[in-house]
Structures are given as C-alpha cells and as structure tokens.
Swiss-Prot record:
UniProt cross-references to PROSITE patterns, sorted A to Z: FKBP_PPIASE
Family: Belongs to the FKBP-type PPIase family.
Class of the enzyme per the UniProt entry, highest EC level: isomerase
Protein name stated in the entry: FK506-binding protein 5
Comp. bias (Acidic residues): 1050-1093, 1152-1168, 1185-1199, 1222-1260, 1320-1335, 1380-1412
Stretches with biased composition (Polar residues): 277-303, 1519-1532, 1581-1609
General function of this protein: PPIases accelerate the folding of proteins by catalyzing the cis-trans isomerization of proline imidic peptide bonds in oligopeptides.
Keywords for the protein's UniProt record, in alphabetical order: Coiled coil, Isomerase, Methylation, Rotamase
Entry GO terms, CC: chromatin; nucleolus
Regulation: Inhibited by both FK506 and rapamycin.
Reactions listed under catalytic activity: [protein]-peptidylproline (omega=180) = [protein]-peptidylproline (omega=0)
Disordered: annotated span: 268-306, 320-432, 518-538, 1043-1097, 1122-1622
Biased composition (Basic and acidic residues): 1169-1182, 1261-1271, 1353-1369
C-alpha cells in the first residue's frame, strides 16, 4: 500500500506527541518533561560505524535505459552492493566494475522505488535515469530485493512499513481495506539490517492464512502492508517493531524486533457493499465511498521535507493527549505567525495570511484533522483534534488576549462553545461555532469523514471571514475505521453541509446577525462500538437556515471544485497584497532614516519640497487603498454569497444528521427489544440445559455402574480362563511326566538286560584272565630266578669298580691336602685384604637383605590372595562332588541289587587283573632296565677315568697360577642368601663385568712387570703378584666407594621399579596359574592311564627293593611326595626339618572323568525341583565336613608337636628369619621319619606310592601293552568306590578333593618311604659296598619290632641334635631316614589310618608337613606322572624343586630352587670351617641313612651332590660353614644370588632360572668357570651331564674346569674327603 508523505511524517513522530501531551495529563507516570530529553528517532547505530557496512552484494549485468532510442543498453557485467552508513543512517545502492569504479550510486530512502520481475530489478537514480539489473537467479534477485526493503525501512528510522513488490504485473484488483485475503507467508527476524532466523511460515502447509484486512485481527503492519497487493504477486514487507509486537514480543520473537515477511496473496474476496450509494431519506445508513472524492483537489498540500518542518510539527503537537496522533504541521505556519505579529490592527490582513497558511498546510494523515487557530498576538491557540479515538479534545486556548478576546478551552472531551467575543478583531465567534459544529466528539466516527471531506470548506470560510483557523485535509481515509458503515455515510453528509453559504463580514462594532446565541444543552447519544471506551460526546449544534434542496454527489463535487478555484484566487490576491505591504513598510523604514547624515541643517525649501512629495505620495497611496478597499468589498460580497451557500449546506447537513439520528435511535430501540427477547430465550434455554444436565448426570452414573459391573465380570472371566489354562497345562505336564517315567522304566529294563549280558561276559573274561594269571605267575617265578643270578653278577662287578675308584680317589686326596697346605700359608699374607672383603660383603648383605624384605612382603600378599582364590575353587569342587554324591544316592535305591552284583564282579576282576598284569609287565621291564643300568655304569666308569686325567692336568696349572688373584673375585662375590632372583641376576651381570675389568688390569700389570727373557724367583713372583693385586684392589675399592653413593640414589628408584615389576610378575603368575588349572584338567584325563601304569610300576619298585637289600647298601631314601598344591614361596626362611612319613594317596588312580560323565547323565534325569531340595542337604553336609576337617587339623598338629625336637640354629642369623609359627612348623617336620618299605610289604598293603620315572621307550611299551592286554572294567557308579584322599593342585592349601576309587581299603594305608636308587648310582654302589658298611655302623638291619623302631627314631633325633649343637650346622632332612621298617609296624599304621579315614575326610597335605622323598628306581627315568622340566633333564641338580607333584603340573623355575640359609661367614682361607672339616664331623653321625652334607637335597627327585664352586654359597662359602647341607626342601623362591642353580655365576657360565629348566647338561656344569669370560679362553667344562659330582673346593673360577670332579653320588655321603695336595 502506498502511503502519503504526511502519513509517514505523522507516524514517525507519534512518540514525541505523547511525550509533549503527557504534560497535560492528570495521571502522568512519566517523571519530568520527556520532550526535553533528547532521543534520536532513528535506530541507534553501532559505535564508530563511520566505515560503510556492506549488507549484500551480487554479480549482475547492468542495463541503462536510453530515452532517445526508448530501449535498454547493456553496460556490461559488473557487481552491485547495498552499503549502509550506521553513523548517519544513510544507505546507498552501488554498481561498480572490477576496478571499483562506481557506475551507479543511488541513495536509498523510504520513497525509493525498486521493482522486481523474476531475475530483473529496475530503479531510477537521483538524475531520473532508469536502470535495470539482471541477476544470475531468481533467488539472488529476491534476496537483493529483501535487503533493499530493509534499507528503505532503516533509512526512515523504522517508523513506517516498507515493501518491494515482486512480479506485481497481475491485472486483478488490488487488495483494499475490508477485503478477505488468503496469504502464504514466511517471516524472519531482522538482525542488524540483515535477514535473521525464520520464526514462522506456512509455505509447507496446504491451507493458506485467511483474515480480513483492517479488522485488527493481525498485527497493524499486516493490515497496512497487504493493501495494494494483487493475486499471485509477492511482496517483501519490512515491519517496524512498533507496528508489530512492540516491547512485549511474542513467543519466539524478542521485544522491539523488526520483522521481515515474504507475502504472496493466493486469493482475495472484496468487501460486501463497497460500491458508492446515496444517503437514504428514511434515515438508514448508507456508504459514501471515499474514492469518489477527486484526489486532484489536494495535490498541492504541503509536505514537510526538512528539519524545520519537523520542529514545527513537534511545537504544533504541544499539549496533545498521548493517546492521539498529532496532525501534520504546515510549512507556512511560521510565516503566518511572523506576519501576524506585524499587523495587529489589520484584521483582514491577518485573516488573509491565515487563509494563505491554511492553503499551504493541507496534509494527508492517518489521523483526524486538527484546527490550529493562532492569534495575532500568538497567545490564542485554538487547536481542534479530531482523531480515530473516541476522545476528541478541541483546545481553543486564547491566552494573553490584549484585545479582550475570550478563552475557548475544550479540555475534557466536550466543546465549550463561545460564539460571541467582546471584540471581533479575530472573529473567534464563528470559528468557535464551526469547531463546535464540525469537530464535536459526539460523532467520532463521523468526524473522520466530515473533516476529510470538508477541510477545503473550512479553509475557505476562515479565509473569507479573516478567521485564524487552520484546517488540514486528508486525501485518504484512515486505514482502520472502527465505525464501519457509519463513517462513510457521514462523510457525504458533512461534505454537503460544508458547501453552504458563507456569512458576510460584519463591521467591528457589529455582531454577525446569522450566528445564533449559545447552543442548547447537548443531547446524549449512544456511543458507537470502539476498541476503547470513551465518554458520550454532546450532539452538534446546527445553525438554523432555510431548507435547501438535497443535492447529489456530483453537484457537491462541482461545488468543491469551484470553491478550490476561488480559494486559489483569494490566495493569489492576498499574496499580492502582502508584497505591496512589504514595499510600503520598507519605504517607511527608509524614510525614517535621515537623508543627510550628520548635524548639517536643512533648508526649509527642501523640507517643503519633501513634504509636498510625501503628501502626493500619500494621496496616491490613499487612492490605491480606496481602490483596494473597493476590491475588498467586492471580495467580501463574494464571500457573503459563498457564506449563504455554506448555510444552505449546513441546513442540509442538519436535516441529514437529524434523519440519521432518528434512524440510529430507532435501530437502538429495536436492538434493545431484540436483546430483551434474546435474554428471555436465553433463560428458557438455560432451564432446558439444567434439566438436560441433570438427566446427563443420572445417565452417567448409570453408565459408570454398568462399567464397574462389566469390569468385575471381565476379571472373573479372565481368572476363570487362567485357571482353565493352568489345569490344561497341569494335565499336559502330567502326561509328559507319565511318558518320561515310561521311558525311564524302559531304559532301566534295557540297562538291566545289558548288565546281565555284561555280567555273563565279565564272568567269561574273568575265567580267561585267571588262566592267564596262572601262566604269568609261572613265567614270573622263572624270571625272578634269572633275575637274581644277573643281579649277583652285577653286584660283583660294581664292587670291583668301586675299589678301583677308591684307590684313585685316595691318591687325589693326598694331592688336595698338599694344595690346601700351600693355600693356608698364603692366607696369613692376605689378612688386610680379608678385612676389605669382609666389609664389602657386609655392605652388600645389608642391601640385599633390605631388598629381600620388600620382596618377601609382596610375595606374602600375593600368596594370601592366591590361597583365598584356591580355597574358593576347592570349595566349589568339593561342593560339586558332594552334589554328585547326593544325586547318585537318589538312583542307588533302584540299583542296589545290580550294584551288589557289580561289586563282586569288579573285585574279583581287579584282583586277577592286577596280579596278571604285574607279573607279565614288570618281568620284561626289569630285564631291560637292568641292562641299561649296566651300560650306564660302564659309561660312568669311563667318565671317571677321564675326569681323573683332567684333574692331574689342572693340578699342574694350579701351581703356575698365582692363588691370590682369587681375592678379587671374593671381594665382589659376597654371599647373600636373602636376595631375590631378579636382583641377584642383575647384580651378577654387573659384578661379572667388574671382575673382568679387574682381572684384565691384574693381567696387564703382571704382564708388564715380567719380561719373557728374564728369570724370576718364586718369592719375587709372589711379591709382584701381591703388589699388583693390592694396587688393583685399592683402586677398585675407591671406585666402588664413589659408585656406592650413586648406587644408593639409584637403588631407591630401582626398588620402586622392582615393585612395579613384581606387580607385573604377579599378573603373569596369575596367568600361569590359570594355565596350570587348565593343565590340571588335562592331567585328570590322564589319571586313568596313569592308574593302570602304576600297577605295573609297583612291581618294578618291589624288585628294586630286593636288589638294594641284597647289596646291603645303605642308600639315602627319598620320601614319596604327595601331590602338593603349588603356592607362592613363603617369605620366611624355613628351618631344617626331618621329613615325616605321610600317607600317599595316588591321584592317578581315580576315574573322575568317567564318573563325572555318568553323573551328568544321571543329573539330566533329575528335575530342577529335586535339585533345589538336594542343595539344602548339601549345605548342611558341607558345614559338618568343615567342622570335621578343623578337628582333624588340630589333632594332627598336636601329634606333630609331641614328637618335635628343638634344633639350634646357625650362629649367623638370617635378617629375614622365620616367625615363631613357621619355626614351630619346621620343628614339627624334623620329627618326620622316612621309612623305606620292602617289596613284600608293598604287595600286601598295596600302598600307593609315587610312580618312578620310566624311559620314553619303556613308557611306550607299557602303554601299548596295557592297551592290548588290559580290558577296562565296566564303568561303575561312584557309590561302588571307596572315598580316598586326592589332593587337588592349586596355588594355596585347600581341602582334599574327595573322589571315589575302585580300590579296596588296603589302598588307603599310610604312605611308605621307598629308598631310591639313582639311575647313576649303581656304579657307585658297587664301589661303596665296603665303605658304606664301615661308615654307617649305626644303621640297623630290618627288624619286625615296632617298639624298637620307634626307639631308634628317638635316638636318631637325639644324635641329630647333638651333631647340630656341636658343629652348629643345620640337620639334613635325610638324617633320620630308616630303611628298616617291618610289616608289623606298617600293618598297625594301616589299620589306624583306615579307621581315621572312615570317620573323617583327611585334610590336604601342606607343603611343610607332606614333603617326602619320592621313590625312584635306578634304571628308570620316566614314569606315568609328569615331572618338572628340571627333574626330567637333570637328576644331579642340587637345587631342584621340592614340590614335584604327580599331577604333571610344571613347577616354575623360581619355585624349583631350594632356599639357602645364610651360611656362617668366616675368613677367606679358613679351611678349618670349610666343607672339608664339616664333612669329617658329619661322618660321625649315627643316622639311619647318612646324608651327603654337600648335597642341596630336594624332596621329589633323586638328588646328587653338585660341583662346588669356589665362590658358591650353595654348600660352603668362602666365608663360613655350610648352611645348606641340612636345608629342608621348600617351595620358597628365595635364592642365593650366587647360587649356581638359580642364578648366573660371576663369570656368566652358570645358567639362570630359565636356563636351569632347558637342558640337562647345564645343571651338572653349574659350577664350572668359563675361562672365556676373563681372558677369552675356551671353557673346559665336563661333558658327562648325568654323572653326579661331589662338592669340593672349586678352583674353576680362576683356572678353568673343575679338577676335582668326583663320580660319587648322593648315596655315598660317608666317603672321606678328597684332599688334593697343593
């Protein structure tokens, strides 16, 4: 919709009028005069925005319109942009080329015309040149047009709506006020002169938005902005916030936000009755269209264009109420006021000036016209405000009236009509009458139309009568008219009234005869419907005049045209008159000045002449004035005629108004009657509604009751259905159960038939096996005879070889004694060095002990966690076994008869089967093993010869080497038993390097001190050696002191790192434990096969026993080790104990796998309900079992304490000594006696012992024979078996797993210790027959009396105590081994054990209590059980694992080494405390089986003495006695860092823990010195890996391989020491 400039101007300043008008309001909320506070009407720009802001830019193709050719001419492809200057509020449209040369620059104002057609945009610059732009797409064109509309609105200060039409070429009618339109729209928020976020849109919906234009149902900006649009055309509409949602905002629209809309009219419907119609005579309202008035009449109305007009407008609105919109001021208002000030006495001139100002101040506005009447004195301001609101206040303020004018004030919404003034200088009487008649508040809606139609008439009257009235006309009606149809009818009537006759001008002393006196009191009219309430205004006063005929609309228009022309003529004449008056006034001014300046006198003639001229001029002026007065008279006559016409119009208007009022009153009365009727109908309808509601509530209650009844019935129906379904399911379950029971009965019948058939077949097999048994027994007797003969021959050969070796050994001992004497002489010379060695040793010991304490604490914590996990695992296993037992019992009732028959068949089958297999298998195996023994003895004999030859060679080298070079190694190699493996290995690497460096220095200095050509004496050589060694040692000690400070700082960091490593090792150990558990499961599968092999091996063991008894050789027995649970080493150093004989329960004899399979089948047949009942019973049984196990533990501990002797410890106490509890446990273990059992006892008692190791070939033969000959008995239920003890492997001590074994009660007897023959010992045994009998006179022959045997054990223990007290050595675990147990003693123990096992479940064996030596047959290397890799590879290692089990679980290398006690520290060459002197003392022991004092014994493998390294602390260190010879076998990982079996030697030749399990050869050469480590030589280690060596003084660390290797085994501990002469 196109707005006039006046409307834009008035809208823009509405806020200022409210501020000024607020001064005159009673309830003013504002503080002070808000008009005095300056606020810019334009939007505040951002600070320092002098630089232009580019709103948008696009590439275009520009065209310029050529008026001559009447076509567009292309200007090329350039770019366009819209630029805004925020500081000035100025916006420009720019078109520029690539060089930024501006081609077009246009200022964008609110009136800027920009049209868009698809991709074309057209505009006109300030020079009137038309331009057209082509965009690349319609989207770019639309965006550009949107920003043009924003810039237009922003340039006008966001005071009015602006728009840009797009494709507005439709020929349909434009939308007008009152039309119903359908619109598709999209709305965005305006953000800093740019398009912001989308807040609403209906483009996606199918139905458009419909509303009636002008009803106020939408925001005011839409009511105004939609007008003028055509169907199918689009419009970009920018609405200021004042015309949108204002300060309140709306949902997603913030307050004071300008809106941007893209509107498209999809349809419109014209308002009904919009066509023009004449006013009806019967008083009915009719519509007079405003469009019928020609707009050409008002084209010359002034428009404010500058800041001066702005200021005048604000002044004109002074005193207006804030609720009204101020009228636009005229540009000539200031002129009229200034001219009136110069002519106070000339009323006509003043009126002419006012009329001229009125003609120049006609404006078009949205608001009603206002009359501003200003006095000549500028004191009387008659302001008439006619607005859209109901309250029209006509303020006629005539203040400071020097001429006696009255004050006409209309402040309260009513017109106080002052028709007569005392003096008519200003003719205010008629003006007031006109104000009252035409500007009354009673017809607010009519005033709009009247003022719009009659502004021209008012201006004419004011000009004719000299009135100071300023009437402003509007070319258009306001956009929103709340009166609806009433306003249009009054417009025509008011227009007709305005064309009446004019009142002629009267003299000053007269009064107008036509103007009547004061009007009668007003008549109250019903107010029209308005948006806001207002007091009812008075009715207008009508001037009485003769009636005039009703004129048509065309005549009215003609009269208005004539009036306009007349006003133009009057205006022209008044302008001429004013110009002449100006000339006259200027002349008077010039005449007032003196002609001649100064005090020069003027002559009278000149004065007279001038006076004559002045008189003539005055006369001329008087004549001209008279002429002008005459003209004025004629003009007044014309005005009178016009006034008469005006009166006619007024009369007509009054008639129309009366008829109109009557019609309105009739309508109102009729409406009142209709309202009364409607109210009566309403009461009737309400009564009916109340009755209907009562019925509704009653029916609703009935419906609710029926619903409740329905719900109850529905619930009952559902419950009945559920019961029915349950009964059906129960029936189906019962049917299924019947079918299952029938199937089970059939299965039982089938199984019964199968068992009968199997019984028959078993009987047949038993008969056949009995026959085979007889044959096997016959063959066995023959084999035994032949065997005895071959054994006698072997014994004779062994005795011969032994004697030969003894002779050679005696010679070597003499040589060793000589060497010893020479070494003793040198010891005194090294006393100073000895002190240094002792100091360094103590320092390193303290460091190692500190590290050991931390390590042991971590190990103890890990041990506890592992024990808890293992106990949980064992409990689960035990509970599972108990559940299986309970489930098995449920089936026993149905199988009792069948089981009884099975037991008889199985027992008979077992006896025959065992006897037959043992007789056949063992006979062949023993022959082969004896042959292998002979071969081994011959090879060993050859090796001993070679070793003797090598020792002689090494003795010669001994004499040439300086012995004092040993000191350097001694300084570094300090024994420390308490260190952990990880620390020891790292220190050994460093020590080895340092020793190499030191030895190289010694070698270099010695080589430099001697010349090859010269000869030296022994004294000089020794002195030079001493000097060199002293220098090197002193230098080394100084370097070490410097390094110690650095190392101490590093050690703290290393401790932290070691703790982290320990945690990682724990995790690895946990993983290994998981792997071990998996291996345990695999071992259980192999138990059945091992059980069968065990039967074969037992016979072999008995035969080996007979061989030993016939040889009358006292052998060191190795007790059978029960299957011991692997656990982490305890941190305490364990005391030496004597192993106690324990009951050996073979874990390989069970058939858990088969039984478990059977149990699973049985378990499937049982329902879950039965299992729940059984679980409760199992829990009770577990509690009872736990109580019994605790009681058994207490009983066993008490028994052990009763027999525990007190053992004194070594003088040198280990810093990590064991606690009291551990010492007590160790003391209890000392009383354990190893009892070797003869063959007859084993056969009768069928005691389960650990299976000896068989060779691979023999094992394959045994397995193949068993598979061929042995027929497995039928699978039996677990109730058929006796419950025996089977220890379960784990990391912690746990309860024994109770399993069932098909074995008689005799198999549950006490464990027997079987003396072991090392497979390398046969050759030595033959040599030692005589010597052993002499050296062990305390060993009694086998006797049958149990009491004597017990007394013997006590004596042995006492002897051990005495020996420990004398020599301060720790007793050997084999010191009280007695191979002379009898059958009577074993039978008594068996009976006691059986009785105890029947009453309770025996506790699992602990590591400390259950460690026993394993029986190993000399000629057999492999057995069905799986041993550790260290056991399989070397039978001669002194520090092998003490916990080798029969479960095939590999023991970790760390756990495999035996913990060494801290040896007693002595001087370097103190040979009195050396192992040689200790050996002579231990020879006097009267033990049952003398132990090798130099053997690092183990509990699971046949151990032999290993080679003694010169600096090794495994046996006797250089600084003390042997503390390891009596060490108890343990599972702790504590190792001597210099242990030859656990860590590297100083010179890198000894294998580490991992290497100890890799090859068998490395274990025998553990103490050899690698000569390449110091001087690049080649190692001269022995190659006989299997030949056990005797502990000795090791010189290999300096001189190469050991020259004193002894072929003697561990079974020859009583041989005299070989003393080599130095």
């Amino acid at each position: 919709m196109n707005f006039s400039e006046e409307e834009e101007y008035s809208n823009r300043n509405a806020a200022s009028s409210q501020k000024l008008g607020s001064l005159f309001k009673d309830n003013n909320a504002m503080s002070g005069n808000q008009s005095l506070q300056y606020t810019n009407n334009k939007t505040q720009s951002s600070a320092n925005s002098n630089s232009p802001d580019v709103l948008i830019s696009f590439p275009i193709h520009l065209y310029k319109f050529d008026n001559n050719k009447n076509e567009y001419v292309s200007s090329g492809s350039i770019a366009t942009a819209i630029v805004g200057y925020k500081s000035s509020g100025k916006y420009q449209l720019l078109a520029y080329d690539n060089n930024k040369n501006y081609i077009v620059t246009v200022n964008i104002t609110a009136q800027f015309n920009y049209s868009v057609t698809t991709i074309y945009g057209s505009f006109t610059d300030g020079n009137g040149q038309n331009w057209s732009m082509t965009f690349n797409s319609a989207e770019e064109s639309t965006k550009y047009a949107t920003h043009v509309a924003i810039a237009k609105c922003a340039s006008g200060g966001y005071q009015q709506i602006t728009f840009v039409d797009i494709n507005n070429q439709s020929k349909t009618k434009p939308v007008a006020n009152g039309d119903r339109v359908s619109i598709k729209y999209a709305g965005w928020l305006e953000n800093n002169q740019r398009v912001g976020s989308l807040f609403d849109s209906n483009l996606q919906s199918e139905t458009p938005f419909r509303f009636v234009v002008g009803e106020g149902k939408v925001i005011k900006g839409w009511d105004l902005g939609v007008i003028g649009m055509r169907k199918s055309a689009k419009r970009i509409l920018v609405i200021p916030s004042e015309l949108a949602y204002g300060k309140k905002g709306h949902s997603t629209i913030p307050p004071n936000t300008n809106l941007i809309f893209d509107l498209e009219v999809t349809g419109s419907k014209k308002k009904e009755g919009s066509e023009p119609s004449l006013p009806s005579l019967n008083g009915q309202p009719s519509n007079a269209p405003q469009q019928s008035l020609p707009t050409q009449l008002f084209d010359n109305s002034p428009v404010p264009q500058d800041d001066k007009a702005n200021l005048l407008q604000r002044v004109a609105k002074l005193g207006r109420a804030t609720g009204f919109t101020s009228p636009p001021p005229s540009d000539s208002e200031n002129e009229s006021n200034s001219r009136n000030s110069h002519s106070n006495n000339s009323h006509n001139n003043n009126n002419n000036n006012n009329s001229n100002s009125n003609n120049n101040s006609n404006s078009n506005s949205n608001n009603n016209n206002n009359n501003n009447n200003q006095n000549n004195n500028n004191n009387n301001n008659n302001q008439n405000n006619n607005q859209n609101n109901n309250n029209n206040n006509n303020y006629n303020n005539n203040n400071n009236n020097n001429n006696g004018y009255n004050n006409n004030n209309n402040n309260n919404g009513y017109n106080n009509n002052n028709n007569y003034n005392n003096n008519m200088n200003n003719n205010n009487g008629f003006n007031n009458g006109m104000n009252n008649g035409f500007g009354n508040n009673s017809m607010n809606g009519m005033n709009n139309g009247f003022n719009n139609g009659m502004n021209g008439m008012n201006n004419g009257m004011n000009g004719g009568f000299g009135m100071n009235g300023n009437m402003y006309t509007s070319s258009q009606s306001p956009q929103f008219n709340p009166m609806g149809t009433f306003g249009s009818a009054y417009n025509q009537q008011q227009a007709l009234i305005g064309s009446g006759a004019l009142v002629p001008i009267m003299p000053q002393h007269q009064q107008p005869s036509i103007i009547v006196a004061s009007p009668p009191p007003p008549v109250q009219q019903a107010p029209p419907p308005t948006p806001a309430p207002a007091p009812p205004p008075p009715t207008p006063v009508i001037v009485q005049a003769p009636p005039a005929p009703v004129q048509s609309t065309t005549e009215t228009i003609q009269i208005l045209v004539e009036e306009k022309q007349f006003k133009k003529e009057i205006k022209h004449s008044i302008d001429q008159f004013n110009s002449k008056l100006d000339q006259v006034s200027s002349k008077f001014d010039s005449l007032a000045q003196p002609i001649v300046k100064g005090d020069v006198p003027i002559s009278g003639v000149l004065l007279v002449q001038t006076l004559h001229r002045l008189v003539e001029d005055n006369e001329k002026l008087i004549k001209e004035n008279v002429e002008k007065e005459n003209r004025m008279v004629t003009l007044k006559e014309n005005i009178a005629t016009l006034h008469k016409k005006n009166e006619q119009f007024l009369e007509e208007n009054t008639k129309m108004m009366e008829s109109r009022n009557e019609a309105i009153t009739d309508n109102v009365a009729q409406m009142r009657r209709q309202i009364i009727d409607l109210q009566k109908q309403k009461t009737l309808v309400e009564d009916d509604l109340a009755d209907k509601q009562m019925l509704h509530t009653k029916s609703q209650s009935v419906i609710n009751q029926l619903k409740r009844d329905y719900n109850t019935l529905q619930e009952e129906l559902n419950s009945a259905k559920e019961e029915n379904q349950k009964s059906i399911q129960d029936q189906e379950a019962l049917k299924q159960a019947e079918k299952d029971y029938a199937l089970k009965i059939r299965a039982f019948k089938k199984s019964l038939l199968d068992e009968k058939n199997a019984r028959k077949s078993d009987i047949e097999k038993i008969n056949s096996l009995e026959d085979e048994l007889k044959d096997a027994q016959d063959s066995l007797t023959q084999a035994e005879k032949s065997n005895e003969e071959s054994l006698k021959r072997l014994k004779l050969d062994m005795v011969r070889i032994k004697k030969r070796n003894d002779d050679k050994v005696s010679q070597l001992t003499l040589e060793i004694t000589t060497l010893k004497d020479t070494l003793e002489t040198e010891r005194s010379a090294l006393s100073s060095v000895q002190t240094l060695v002792e100091n360094t040793r103590l320092e390193t010991e303290s460091k190692f002990n500190l590290l050991l304490i931390k390590k042991e604490e971590a190990i103890a914590a890990a041990e506890l966690s592992l024990s808890e996990e293992q106990s949980k695992y064992n409990k689960l296993v035990q509970s599972n076994n108990q559940q299986i037992d309970q489930l098995q019992k449920l089936i026993d009732d149905a199988k009792k008869k069948l089981d009884h028959e099975k037991e008889e068949v199985i027992k008979s089958y077992k006896k025959g089967f065992a006897e037959g297999i043992e007789s056949t298998k063992q006979e062949n195996d023993l022959i082969t093993t004896l042959q292998q023994q002979i071969q081994q003895l011959t090879t060993q004999y050859d090796d001993t010869k070679k070793s003797l030859i090598e020792t002689k060679e090494k003795l010669s080298t001994l004499e040439s080497q300086p012995p004092k070079t040993i000191v350097k190694e001694v300084i570094v190699k300090v024994p420390s038993d308490g260190t952990t493996v990880a620390v020891a290995s790292s220190n050994n690497v460093d020590v080895a390097k340092e020793v190499k460096v030191c030895m190289q220095k010694v070698f270099v200095q010695v080589s430099e001190s001697f010349d090859e050509d010269e000869e030296y004496s022994t004294d000089s050589i020794m002195s030079t050696f001493k000097d060199v060694i002293k220098r090197v040692t002193v230098e080394y000690i100084q370097e070490q002191k410097e390094k110690q400070q650095q190392q101490q700082e590093k050690e703290e960091e290393e401790v932290v790192e070691e703790e982290e490593k320990e945690e990682e090792e724990k995790e690895e150990e946990e993983k290994e434990e998981e792997e071990k558990e998996e291996e345990k499961e695999e071992e259980k599968e192999q138990e059945e096969e091992e059980e069968e092999k065990e039967v074969v091996v037992e016979e072999i063991v008995t035969i080996a026993e007979e061989v030993k008894e016939e040889e009358v050789v006292v052998e060191e027995p190795v007790t059978v080790v029960e299957e011991v649970k692997e656990e982490k080493p305890t941190p305490a150093i364990e005391e030496p104990v004597v192993a106690k004989s324990q009951t050996v329960v073979d874990p390989l004899s069970t058939k858990d796998d088969e039984d478990d399979d059977d149990d699973e089948d049985d378990y499937d047949d049982i329902n879950e309900e039965d299992l729940k009942n059984i679980d409760a019973e199992i829990e009770k049984m577990q509690q009872e079992m736990g109580d019994e196990l605790e009681d058994d533990d207490d009983e066993e501990e008490e028994k052990e304490k009763e027999t525990a002797p007190v053992v004194t410890k070594s003088e040198v106490v280990d810093p990590l000594s064991s606690t009291k509890e551990e010492s007590e446990e160790e003391e209890e273990e000392e009383t354990k006696v190893e009892v070797p059992v003869l063959e007859e006892e084993k056969e009768e008692e069928e005691t389960k012992v650990e299976v000896p190791v068989l060779e691979d070939e023999q094992e394959d033969k045994v397995e193949s024979d068993v598979e061929e000959k042995i027929v497995e008995p039928p699978t039996l239920d677990e109730d058929d078996f006796e419950k025996v003890e089977v220890p379960v492997l784990g990391d912690d001590e746990q309860d024994e797993k109770v399993v069932e074994e098909p074995a008689p009660e005799e198999e549950e007897e006490t464990k027997v210790e079987v003396p072991v023959l090392n497979k390398d010992d046969d050759e030595d045994n033959e040599k030692d027959v005589a010597s052993d009998s002499e050296e062990t006179p305390s060993t009694p022959p086998p006797i049958d009396d149990v009491e004597e045997e017990e007394e013997k054990e006590e004596k042995v223990v006492e002897q051990v105590k005495e020996e420990i007290n004398e020599t301060k050595f720790e007793s050997s675990p084999f010191a009280v081994d007695e191979p002379t147990t009898t059958e009577e003693k074993e039978e008594e123990k068996e009976e006691e054990k059986v009785e105890e096992e029947e009453e309770k479940v025996v506790e699992p064996p602990t590591i400390d209590d259950d460690e026993t030596t394993a029986p190993v047959i000399p000629s057999i290397d492999n057995s069905p059980r799986q041993t550790t890799t260290e056991e399989e590879e070397s039978s001669t290692t002194a520090a092998t694992t003490s916990t080798t089990t029969t479960s095939s679980t590999p023991v970790k290398p760390d756990e495999a080494d035996t913990t060494k006690k801290t040896p007693k520290k002595t001087s370097f060459f103190d040979f009195d405390d050396s192992p040689f002197s200790a050996e002579t003392e231990t020879e006097t022991k009267s033990t049952a089986a003398s132990s090798d004092p130099f053997a690092d014994t183990t509990s699971s493998t046949p151990t032999s003495t290993k080679k003694k390294d010169f600096f090794s602390t495994d046996d006797d260190s250089l600084f003390g006695n042997s503390s390891d010879i009596f060490d108890k076998p343990s599972t702790t990982t504590k190792k001597d860092p210099f242990d030859t079996d656990s860590t590297d030697d100083l010179f890198g030749s000894i294998k580490t823990n991992k290497e100890s399990t890799s090859t068998a050869s490395s274990t025998s050469n553990g103490g050899l010195f690698d000569s390449d480590s110091l001087f690049g030589g080649i190692s001269v280690a022995k190659s006989n890996n299997n030949t056990p060596s005797r502990q000795k003084q090791d010189f290999s660390s300096l001189f190469g391989s050991d020259p004193t290797i002894s072929p003697l085994t561990e079974t020859e501990p009583e041989e005299k020491e070989i003393v080599l002469p130095l």
